A protein has these predicted regions:
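Membrane-interface helix/loop caps of multi-pass membrane proteins
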Residues: 2-17, 21-260
Length: 260
């Protein structure tokens, strides 16, 4: 499935149809390494690790996860916009295939290894609990599972699932499923004008960010556990990254780096 991209680059051969890619001799610029993005990602990882290790002074290190969501929104939106502007279309199927190839093998390997280790170390009682968590994590719904189970992310007492960190991967994958479809819908609604598409994309993102942030504030006060794991209360972070990608995309010859 494809959608016509927002514009043709100056001096490039005009596209002849909705699914037309670059013409002969028109190389498509590839994503480049972004040292600043990788550096920010490293800082976020370190903050989360120090928080989990209970290092004094890093009790708020969990905000590294928020930074990750902003980075994800920035990179994925940047790749989609870049593909549209350089190829004249967005391949939804290709996007999903790349996500599967990049995420599924390692994710599945860690899941299987963790479940087996849980049975080996903790016996059937622990193994069964971790296996149940793994079943949800395998379909990228760990965040929904932990929210429904009433898991308190900030309460480290009692049993803590070794797969609890899969909740953030669930939020990201849910975003990856829906966001390209929304971009596709915007492209179909405003198929004739690149400027209209860009403005509509920004408008949709602003509404998404404001609504999600308001819902996050409300839910955090009334249901903090659900608010922590919910994709609806996290959408504003991904949306901010997406807004940055759209704002910085004009005139860029390379897609955002980061190996997405």
């Amino acid at each position: 499935m494809t959608v016509t991209g927002p514009r043709t680059r100056p001096h490039a051969r005009p596209a002849t149809g909705p699914g037309t890619g670059p013409g002969p001799g028109e190389a498509v610029a590839k994503p480049r390494f972004r040292a600043e993005v990788e550096g920010l990602r490293a800082v976020a990882v370190l903050a989360v690790a120090l928080d989990h290790a209970a290092v004094p002074g890093f009790g708020g290190g969990f905000v590294g996860v928020d930074v990750f969501f902003v980075i994800s929104g920035f990179l994925i939106t940047g790749l989609l916009v870049h593909e549209a502007e350089t190829r004249g279309r967005i391949s939804i199927g290709g996007f999903y295939a790349r996500r599967v190839r990049r995420i599924l093998p390692l994710s599945a390997f860690v899941l299987v290894l963790t479940v087996l280790a849980s049975y080996a170390v903790g016996g059937s009682a622990i193994g069964n609990r971790v296996a149940a968590d793994g079943a949800w994590a395998s379909v990228f719904l760990a965040n929904v599972h932990f929210a429904q189970s009433g898991v308190d992310y900030f309460n480290r007492g009692g049993f803590v699932s070794p797969l609890e960190h899969y909740w953030s991967l669930g939020v990201e994958e849910q975003f990856y499923v829906l966001w390209p479809l929304l971009i596709l819908a915007i492209g179909l609604v405003a198929a004739s004008s690149a400027r209209t598409r860009r403005r509509l994309t920004v408008a949709v993102l602003v509404v998404l960010v404001v609504a999600s942030l308001a819902w996050s504030v409300t839910q955090t006060a009334s249901s903090p556990t659900a608010a922590y794991f919910s994709p609806f209360t996290r959408a504003w972070e991904l949306g901010i990254g997406a807004l940055l990608a759209v704002a910085l995309s004009r005139g860029r010859r390379h897609a955002p780096g980061g190996g997405r």
